Design a protein with these regions (language model features):
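N-terminal Rossmann-like NAD(P)+-binding domain of SDR-like oxidoreductases, especially those catalyzing
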Residues: 1-183
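Short, flexible, glycine-rich and Lys/Arg-enriched loop motifs at helix boundaries
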Residues: 38, 168, 179-199, 210-231
Length: 341
């Protein structure tokens, strides 16, 4: 079965390509390399000993999409492509809505014309806003979303639901991720944010290898056990395996699944686990809360276990261990010394 993976050179996309190839799927990737690097795909091939097909380009390029579908005839799409920085989305709402929404609409239009009606969408727990209750089940109402990035995830979910209502032949699976961290155990692929990392673990990783001085912990006065924000962290390899299960068990209609461990960890829990993984203290300082941050957000992943047979295998210590292994082997990410020169 041939799968088109949009944004397949990115962090979650590249790990999912590994799982797909290891499960004997044919993989075609389209990625504009805005947030990613082609080297990740070379390493996916090295890890798996298999080849994939890569098209560099944008979902906003309809001619390219038609060329891909003409040449490859994929049977299903896993859709990761999109701008993804919360802070940047507040500064650049027009770019975020145009890229993420218009790109998805063009993709779905070409899929429809080529009779490819199976899509797994990379959504996010951000659609729950400040959740009405925790742990969060899939029927938790969507909350107030405080940034354009989160709004695009919620809007794309609704677009895909509406497409499926209009044409029952569509199979739509919406995967709401919690907080993916970690890296492939080989240390060959991992998270490589450009510039100063926005997310907690890549930031800690840069501190651990001496690239950054110390971690800023935003708020220690939340209503949580140690006062710092609590999140559900999930190993990226577990998350990638969830996509393969979702693809394997696709059915007509719309299916929605939370992908998380069901376990909440505070910022300081993660700092402690990372210190253990790297064998050194992670210096940090407490800073004021960030606007829009919530106290606690963690999943109830029961539905994915019952319907997909999927369950996270890795705990926070393995997540931090694999993150540190990746960062130690690749202190400058995918960038080579020649590129830096």
């Amino acid at each position: 079965m041939k799968i088109l993976v949009t944004g397949g050179a990115g962090y979650i996309g590249s790990h999912t390509c590994v799982e797909l190839l290891n499960n004997d799927y044919e993989v075609v990737v389209v990625d504009n390399l805005y947030n990613s690097c082609e080297e990740a795909l070379n390493r996916v091939e090295k890890i798996t000993g298999k080849t994939l097909t890569f098209y560099e380009g944008d979902l906003l390029d309809q001619d390219l999409l038609e060329e891909i579908f003409d040449n490859e005839r994929p049977e299903a799409v896993i859709h990761f492509a999109g701008y993804k920085a919360v802070g940047e989305s507040v500064e650049k709402p027009i770019e975020y809505y145009h890229n993420n929404i218009t790109g998805t609409l063009l993709l779905c239009d070409v899929m429809r014309r080529y009779d490819c009606k199976k899509i797994v969408f990379s959504s996010s727990a951000t659609v729950y806003g400040d959740p009405a209750f925790v742990p969060i089940t899939e029927d938790c109402p969507k909350g107030v979303i405080t940034n354009p990035y989160g709004q695009t995830k919620s809007m794309i979910e609704q677009i895909l639901i509406d497409i499926q209502v209009s044409d029952p032949e569509w199979n739509v699976t919406l995967l709401r991720y919690f907080n993916p961290i970690g890296a492939h155990s080989s240390g060959l692929i991992g998270e490589d944010p450009k510039g100063i990392p926005n997310n907690l673990v890549p930031y800690i990783a840069r501190v651990a290898v001496g690239k950054l001085e110390k971690l800023g912990v935003f708020g220690n006065d939340y209503d949580t056990p140690d006062g710092t924000g609590v999140r559900d962290y999930i190993h990226v390899v577990d998350l990638a395996a969830g996509h393969v299960q979702a693809l394997r068990d696709m059915k007509q209609g719309v299916s929605i699944y939370n992908l998380g461990t069901g376990q909440g960890y505070s910022v300081l829990d993660v700092v402690k686990a990372y210190s253990k993984a790297c064998g050194k203290e992670i210096p940090y300082e407490i800073k004021p809360r960030r606007a829009g941050d919530i106290a606690a957000c963690y999943s109830d992943p029961t539905k994915a276990k019952e319907e997909l047979g999927w369950k996270a295998k890795y705990g926070i210590e393995e997540m931090c261990r694999d993150s540190y292994h990746w960062q130690s082997m690749n202190p400058d990410g995918y960038q080579t010394k020649q590129e830096q020169a």
